[in-house]
Amino acid sequence: MLVVFTSYPIGFVLAGVAILFGLIGSLTGVFSLVEFFLFTSRIWFIADNLQIIAVPLFVFMGVMLERAEIAKDLLETLQILLRRVPGGMAMAVTVMSTVFAAITGIIGATVVIMTLIALPPMLKAGYRPELALGTIAASSTLGILIPPSILLVFLAELLPMSIGTLFAAALYPGLLLSALYLIYIGGYSFAVPAAVPSLTRTTTTMGATQIIAIIVRGVLPPVALIGMVMGSILTGFVTITESASVGAAGALLLAATRGKLTWHNLQESLHRSAMMIGMIFFLFVGATCFSYVFRVLGGDDLILALVDNSGVGSWGILLIA
């Protein structure tokens, strides 16, 4: 933890600490050098796993949709639909983050995108900085829970579990957490009206045709893509890799229909995807090495003993966690 607070890349921290304590364990006779060099076989297992191909495809899908300005259009659409609700822009950001979490599956991408496109308009509209930043920071982290979360893909490979089953199990808690965020924003806006801008009465009204047109352009494309990707995974119709391929192809199709599929945007999307994928995979490699040394040195047994002897019960463990 001390090294993590130095802002050094977490992947390097985990791998470095694992190697350091692995060498200490070898010198003290906890495990042999043969067991120590099992690092290489574990890393090769990651690289040789065909299911992991879904990770770069999901990353590219999210980056390509961001370059096609899908996120910007979706946020503007939600702001229009929620313009008469107290704290409507903050709620729009939360809904937008939920949808984009289901597109990218990465926290970092959602945080960066939402900060760039949502924070300036919220501050300009009169939202308190703590509410604006808190909304973005909290809702952007839904990408770690809502499928297709990249973490869940890796977790399914580490555990003997089906990816579709794990996605289905994580979907409802993620949506519930998003709903709780919306309830909190509504309650906070009612209790502290100074934290949100006052509702302005507008003389212009929108007809049903205009509202439908806005929804079709801003909401329908990303929701349809999410439904296609997630539906194919949860029903077991295709594998996770095939579903990710469909998502990447769908992102390219949406970009083409909006006139954003240019050579420059494609190059930028591939470059950003490669940078993010490298970071993600090295983080996973470091975490794999760290967990291996942690188990060999008896870390799992120590935690289980602490939990068993704590006497706080299952609800107490839940509160502590």
What function would you assign to each model-found segment?
Residues 1-321:
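Alpha-helical transmembrane segments of multi-pass membrane transport proteins
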